């Protein structure tokens, strides 16, 4: 396709951009009465009063603009006009491409295709973000409409025989190939493959079917995503006498509503109450009922998933593929469904016995079995149910209540500003990159809580922009995300209108389109005695922020001439590597000690507290890895081979429960949770990528950073051998280079097995 979307958007001269950095770097801020010194970067996230005063000054003294400094984006009408004008520009570019006949035109053909792709991407990626994160519903609706319109045109282009044939002519002409850059040849090969995956050589009627099917999949997939947070019932009824006799705390039952008869408690399926019941109710039947209610989705959601799977079966059959997985895994690192299943099975074989041993304490507790009695893995796995995990884990944790208290204490060493500032310091040490606050113009952001960070390279200056939308907001998406709004690319030769993009300049004077990304999280704030509201991060939230910043660095440092292969526009089963590698930094005590300082005393985070936390992260970690492997196998199962005659009988919930029963380890044979597994749309047939990249990241960490997480040599190695290539270089070659294992360069089943043979993920 002309767009490779990832998991899953002013007037300026060609002179170097004058950075609108707030000139406060180095300025010190007195926090309350503690005497704590902070940097400007830290202050804009931690001091809500200061941020409010800055925002008011911005409103008073800066000029008006649109979202992301795009002057169109001041209203929903402007968004629609931007989409309309971009579509008009795309039509003109497509016509120029169709009429390319001279040698000079053919030499520039791939670059012009990339420009066409960029024109589409800048609308589709923008709308992907707006429909997910904008607080104004009218923007969400306008973005959905523009996305559908542009996505449909993209699918039309993907089946344009004239465009495809001319691209083939270019790639088969030795004289033209001689003058094309490596990037142009790579992009040409990618785009030709995308044409072929779209059934370009089939009859016109079939190509039209492809367009229609792709559009239907996009629409039903978005509906599926939009409904993953909903449970089947708002509450369930449990008999009062059974609940009262269960041994659960009367303080908890006193918080429950009763039905009209007074004979039943109404247990909600949202909030903290059902989670507290799972942790504290000794009655297994009640826990089972509550657990299933929390995991069940409405039948309509299963119907959406079934329809999504059916449409993908029809699409893959139309294109002559055995399965949707076959279709998706072309040109991925894995190469084939067989290799993916082999990787998952290898990982499961390593992990399953370790997971069983982790659950042994629950099995013994349930049976009151003495330590002297041997319990086989199968016996353990047949005894321990998913609704047991929270209850018995809570009993286990309650033996060390001080550890729980220390966990809560720990977060006050990690304000959001502390962590962002620490990330900047880390990036400076390993990559030569810093994050600097930048003043925004009126209308540049979609919420007053959004902070803009300019990404500054020691060698290149301004290399990108990150918009941080990190604080909780009503109606905001619940999952953290990295959105590519605008890709890095060199300015095209005939480009002279920079009003809708932000630009930078390389050290050699080359002008390029700045990569612009948005990081979206939902972190809560607390009120402090001095009247400020500050966000203190739990340790898992720190890991989340590091993960998303890993994606951001990939976007910033993967700076290629052409946007089709810049940053995160790479193989789906490679794209999570930089982000998961960052999780290792977030779990390293040396890094955490550098970042953490108490918000009142400025003392560094105590080593004992951090060690306690890191020890707790190992609790049931193999169960978590195995759970991810089951999800990856479900993804392969739902996108495996189905005959067209069988598609009406596809029942994703039955497939899910049957697979769970066979694979064991906290097997779910009670709920239809698969309807809440949103990645089945965005990562259809490629969810294994998460585990695969975890396994690779573990090996990269051990090779480059385990001995010293601040190692500049290791950072430069990862930057030069992985990050800077974006999607240009074969991922297996990148891995072979960074691990210094040449045999991995050819990929295939043996390489997949090597990666899958990992315990420490």
Swiss-Prot record:
UniProt-annotated location(s): Mitochondrion matrix
Pfam families (UniProt xref): Peptidase_M3 (PF01432)
Enzymatic class: hydrolase
InterPro entries: M3A_MIP, MetalloPept_cat_dom_sf, Neurolysin/TOP_dom2, Pept_M3A_M3B, Pept_M3A_M3B_dom
Cofactor: record remark: Binds 1 zinc ion.
Transit peptide feature range: 1-37
UniProt KW keywords: Hydrolase, Metal-binding, Metalloprotease, Mitochondrion, Protease, Transit peptide, Zinc
Cellular component GO terms, alphabetical: mitochondrial matrix
The protein's name in its UniProt record: Mitochondrial intermediate peptidase
């Amino acid at each position: 396709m002309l767009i490779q979307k990832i998991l899953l958007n002013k007037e300026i001269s060609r002179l170097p951009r004058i950075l609108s950095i707030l000139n406060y770097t180095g300025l010190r801020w007195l926090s309350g009465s503690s005497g704590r010194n902070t940097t400007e970067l830290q202050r804009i996230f931690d001091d809500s009063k200061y941020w409010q005063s800055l925002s008011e000054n911005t409103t008073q003294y800066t000029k008006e603009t649109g979202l992301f400094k795009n002057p169109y984006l001041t209203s929903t009408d402007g968004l629609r006009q931007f989409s309309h004008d971009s579509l008009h520009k795309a039509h003109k570019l497509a016509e120029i491409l169709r009429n390319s006949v001279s040698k000079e035109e053919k030499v520039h053909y791939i670059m012009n295709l990339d420009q066409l792709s960029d024109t589409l991407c800048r609308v589709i990626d923008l709308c992907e973000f707006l429909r997910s994160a904008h607080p104004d519903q009218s923007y969400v609706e306008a973005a959905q409409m523009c996305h559908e319109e542009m996505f449909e045109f993209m699918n039309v282009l993907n089946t344009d025989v004239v465009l495809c044939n001319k691209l083939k002519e270019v790639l088969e002409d030795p004289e033209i190939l001689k003058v094309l850059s490596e990037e142009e040849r790579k992009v040409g090969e990618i785009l030709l493959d995308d044409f072929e995956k779209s059934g370009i050589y089939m009859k016109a009627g079939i190509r039209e079917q492809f367009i229609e099917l792709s559009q239907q999949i996009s629409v039903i997939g978005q509906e599926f995503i939009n409904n993953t947070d909903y449970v089947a019932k708002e509450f369930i009824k449990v008999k009062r006498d059974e609940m009262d006799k269960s041994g659960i705390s009367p303080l908890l039952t006193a918080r429950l509503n009763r039905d009209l008869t007074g004979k039943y408690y109404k247990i909600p399926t949202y909030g903290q109450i059902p989670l507290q019941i799972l942790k504290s109710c000794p009655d297994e039947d009640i826990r089972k009922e509550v657990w299933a209610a929390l995991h069940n989705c409405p039948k309509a959601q299963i119907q959406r998933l079934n329809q999504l799977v059916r449409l993908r079966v029809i699409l893959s059959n139309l294109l002559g593929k055995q399965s949707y997985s076959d279709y998706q895994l072309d040109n991925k690192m894995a190469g084939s469904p067989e290799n993916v299943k082999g990787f998952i099975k290898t990982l499961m074989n390593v992990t399953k016995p370790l997971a069983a041993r982790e659950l042994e304490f629950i099995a013994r507790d349930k049976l009151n079995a003495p330590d002297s009695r041997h319990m086989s893995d199968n016996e353990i796995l047949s005894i321990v149910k998913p609704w047991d995990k929270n209850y018995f884990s809570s009993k286990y944790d309650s033996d060390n209540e001080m550890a729980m208290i220390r966990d809560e204490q720990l977060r006050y060493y990690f304000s959001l500003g502390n962590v962002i500032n620490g990330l900047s310091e880390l990036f400076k040490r390993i990559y030569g990159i810093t994050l600097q606050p930048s003043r925004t113009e009126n209308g540049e952001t979609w919420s007053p809580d959004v902070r803009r960070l300019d990404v500054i390279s020691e060698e290149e200056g301004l290399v990108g922009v990150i918009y941080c939308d990190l604080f909780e907001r009503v109606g905001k998406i619940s999952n953290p995300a990295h959105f590519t709004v605008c890709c890095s690319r060199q300015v095209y030769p005939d480009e002279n209108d920079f009003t809708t993009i932000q630009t930078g300049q390389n050290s050699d004077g080359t002008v390029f389109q700045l990569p612009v990304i948005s990081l979206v999280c939902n972190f809560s704030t607390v009120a402090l005695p001095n009247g400020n509201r500050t966000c203190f991060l739990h340790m898992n939230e720190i890991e989340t922020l590091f993960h998303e910043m890993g994606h951001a660095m990939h976007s910033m440092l993967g700076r290629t001439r052409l946007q089709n292969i810049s940053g995160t526009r790479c193989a789906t089963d490679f794209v999570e590597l930089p982000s998961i590698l960052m999780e290792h930094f977030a779990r390293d005590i040396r890094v955490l000690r550098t970042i953490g300082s108490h918000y009142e005393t400025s003392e560094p985070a105590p080593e004992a507290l951090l060690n306690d936390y890191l020890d707790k992260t190992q609790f049931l970690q193999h169960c978590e890895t195995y759970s991810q492997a089951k999800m990856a196998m479900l993804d392969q199962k739902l996108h495996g081979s189905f005959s067209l005659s069988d598609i009406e009988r596809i029942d994703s919930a039955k497939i899910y429960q049957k697979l769970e029963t066979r694979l064991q380890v906290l097997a779910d044979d009670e709920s239809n949770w698969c309807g809440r597994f949103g990645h089945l749309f965005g990562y259809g047939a490629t969810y294994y990528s998460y585990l695969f990249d975890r396994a690779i990241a573990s090996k990269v960490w051990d090779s480059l950073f385990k001995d010293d997480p601040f190692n500049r040599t290791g950072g430069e190695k990862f930057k030069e051998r992985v990050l800077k290539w974006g999607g240009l270089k074969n991922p297996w070659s990148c891995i072979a280079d960074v691990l210094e294992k040449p045999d991995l360069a050819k990929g295939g089943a043996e390489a997949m097995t090597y990666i899958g043979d990992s315990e420490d993920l």
